[in-house]
């Protein structure tokens, strides 16, 4: 027998898929609960439907085979992408069929976006307000019109094509999801090959994706937007493909195209400076970032990511190995350092998801701030309603993602954490000194809470006593945010030093002039004062409490002094059995539950701060002499320094539009405001409640049914403690978010 040398063995192509692993069976899918042996037997009690929902997507409970779990998650991703593309297609279809997009394009300063017309059933057509240009419909605040203009879409036919393209894409995604689970399913080794994955994600998805987008921006968006900015009628603008096929059209707008690719290969890149610009600031016509700056940015990002994708060792013996990087990463005080983290992240999808959600959530909140400080789309900056809505949207989405990160970190700790792998590494060391971490964090929360709230209480008291000279304010005892002001000045001065070719600062929010578009403020310096200093410390307080709850849930998910064997009880359990009082509501799930309330609490204050600050100090009109009149007349600095000011001059004053909306086009928001308060109050019935009360009530109702011989075959059961809390928090958040939605919309659509 001949023994091949190892290097010849390695060169064989590896088979990394299984063929036809799982049959496609509609009969199986039609059976409710087919994924769980107990559930598949059908319902005995009403708890069955709850467990069906709780476990349908909990792949860990379907099988313990990591390969099968990985395949299910992979297939589910394609399903998710299909749902997203169908949803987007629907939005774009509405834009094509029911909207005033073309009228808005011709006059974006005076026509407001609308993509929904209500049918005249029992008088509901009152909701179709006059949005300008003779169109009546519901004003939308999703920013889609601004995005489409940025893409270079000039008519509804292009929107129809895009909508159909979205559906085709959804079909491809659905097919891919089915194909990669039922026909050619990747093996576990493929899912765990992190270097190839980084290679693909960085280089192909992010790198080539950005490069393709830069191409679209250069060849389609930039020329079309340049013509629209110059006031060329939409019907006279060439169609997107004409710019690509007819080079002379591009050369007329950007002479740099005349030289072709020669400057690229001769490294004479300056010739492309007319369409790859570095202007900084905002386009004075649209109030958005310069399209050519955005193209330049995406080209640079593409280069960075394509290079980054080449860093990792795959089939050739060069490049980084993630395992080696992690295992060599040891500090003087961190024991085994990052050893073991590679195994955690390649065998636990929860660990992977937890880190990704935490990063993505933080990034989403950063995006919320970029959308107003550096509005990327044309005419977004002057559409105040849209600005407020997309800020609020991104803030809340980010909050949910961060709480989800903590949830999956706790699930990782309970289900996937292996103490043998994590010996004296950074994770083990953090868990071992968790008492110090949590007690310090607790102290910080108490300190921040008392001091930040105390400043407000002091001001309320002094104002009530008629002693304004003793208040913390810009006109009495000043507490200026000096570090924030320093950062603002630094950024205003930076373009001359760090980016010598930039013509304007990165964002007028930091400093510079007032940019007005059509007599409305697009952006101007946001001056910070004592009121911002006070509310900033409330933000610090609420964020730290949220972190305290979530981090405690993760660090004590496996064990605590109270329940040393917590890991055996699972991610969610109501109490540690009978006879152990005081062990309720300590599971990982319960910490996520509590964290959600504080996340909502934190972010409500963030969006209130933003809404009032922008209306008071940024948004408004500019007259011919250059004088700015803000929506609420700059009242933030003196009113936002007391609790009473927040209640009276923000909540109550700005609720007048939603409260008085009946009989107007905004009346739906009045009903929503009422209905959402009701949903919120309904949540309290589940949150301030005991399971026994409901079970007792159900028993007597069942007795009455038995008396009348109409007893159901499926036994009614009261919600478990955990189910009741889940229903409670869901309605609390839904009610709170929809109330805020109605409050913000009715006000800003009236005054913005």
Swiss-Prot record:
Coiled-coil spans in chain: none
GO molecular function, one term: chlorophyll binding
One Gene Ontology cellular component: plasma membrane-derived thylakoid membrane
Catalytic reaction equation(s): reduced [plastocyanin] + hnu + oxidized [2Fe-2S]-[ferredoxin] = oxidized [plastocyanin] + reduced [2Fe-2S]-[ferredoxin]
Binding site for chlorophyll a: 685, 693
Recorded family membership: Belongs to the PsaA/PsaB family.
Protein known as: Photosystem I P700 chlorophyll a apoprotein A1
